[in-house]
Amino acid sequence: VASFKGLRTALPRHNASSGKLDTMETLVNNCRTERMGAEPWKWSKGKMTAMTSLISLQSRGMPMNVKVDGNVAGAYKMGEELYYTRVGQLEMSCANCHEDNYGNMIRADHLSQGQINGFPTYRLKNAKMNSIHGRFKGCMKNIRATPYKEGSEEFRALELYVASRGNGLSVESPSVRN
């Protein structure tokens, strides 16, 4: 696993073959299906979050350095628009919590600035490892919006934008939170 050192710092990134964004989950599943002839794992289930936690751990302490120009510029823009667009019955955007109210309490937790350098993260409230897209899905449900599918183009773009906001921060995965 030492060969994965630094990988987490640069994801998501452009995949020249598919023309899409690669996340750690897509890299794991591509390896499983194309190299191992195995079935893909579900995006946010135990085996996947265990593997992405192990891979992310190899980059712990290294600074995030996600590229946002060139082939990923369109996805970056889409992610930024998703971050600031109000959705759901509560008409909230990511920015309403993670910019306007970070540091305040929501339920039993402090609102963060929405950084993902600690994902996958172990949540005390559900006693398991949680993926980035699983957290996005949970946020959307909390504001009564219809969430995108984990692994969707929208969530990959949002992951790129949010990861780029953490450029320069150290990878802390796997982390622990309420």
Q: Predicted regions: what is each one?
A:
Residues 5-15, 110-118:
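Short cysteine/histidine-rich metal-coordination sites, predominantly Zn2+-binding motifs
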Residues 66-68, 91-95, 107-111:
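Short acidic alpha-helical/loop segments enriched in Asp/Glu that coordinate divalent cations
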Residues 84-88:
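Short, flexible, mixed-charge glycine/proline-rich loop motifs
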